[in-house]
Amino acid sequence: MTMTGRGGGNFYVLALVFSGITMHEAATTGQFILICSSLTATIFFWKNKVVDWKLVLLIGGLTLVSAFFGGYYSDKFGGNLMKIIFAIFIFLASVLMLKPFKKQSELSNSYSIRLSLGTIVRHINLYIFIPVVLVTGFVSGMVGISGGSFLVPLIVLVIGVPMHIAVATSTTLVLITATAGFLGHLSTGHFNIEIAVILAIVALTGSLTGTQLTLKTNPEALKIIFAVTSMIAAFIMMYKIFY
């Protein structure tokens, strides 16, 4: 999952729920695992100079706040409702990733900001950008996923960043979102440190492999892998709810 810029929160939470752990505890544990796996991935991408730090600062500030409150208020939502939100959220993300990329000329308007990313100038539509980032942060913090499920489509489709840079940048943002969400969840007391540490060590191995594969994989293949794995996670969670 690190290979597609999501960190793996979708499947961490799924695996924990299927093992009998409550949704609230699974969300907290998932966030902790994400912190560990995305930290190592961020260091790797940073060394390879594929992280767009301007986007990290722009998006990170919004997700930091909204993810914390998502985790903090997660106790107000029932377990099944959180599972439904989880499934709908990542299914929509998979559908969005299958959409064709739009040229920047189609995206810019009077309600956009101009952002220079290296030698390329991008126009970011604030009417789309701000609500999507805030909702992504809140839901990610609440249900324990990385946020990369929506951040990658946002960075690729709305801003027009190449897939490899989007994955690397999203991974860095996952670290920010997961940390904020974890701190919010931690205040509710839903955390089993023994399970979390063991799973985090296992996840680190996959994270190191995934980051290296990212830079070697065709961008279109990354998009398809992203979409298919998101759909699978959504359908598995819906199955868990009704069966």
PLM feature spans:
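Conserved glycine-rich helix-kink/hinge and helix-boundary motifs of the Major Facilitator Superfamily
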Residues: 27-28, 167-168, 227
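Hydrophobic alpha-helical transmembrane segments of multi-pass integral membrane proteins
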Residues: 135, 168-181
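Short hydrophobic/aromatic, small-residue-rich stretches within specific transmembrane helices
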Residues: 30-34, 170-174, 195-196, 200
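Transmembrane alpha-helices of multi-pass small-molecule transport proteins
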Residues: 29-44
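Juxtamembrane transmembrane-helix boundary motif
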Residues: 2, 14-18, 23, 43-138, ...
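Interfacial segments of multi-pass membrane proteins
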Residues: 11-25, 150-165
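Short helix-coil transition sites and intra-membrane helix breaks within transmembrane domains
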Residues: 1-10, 140-147
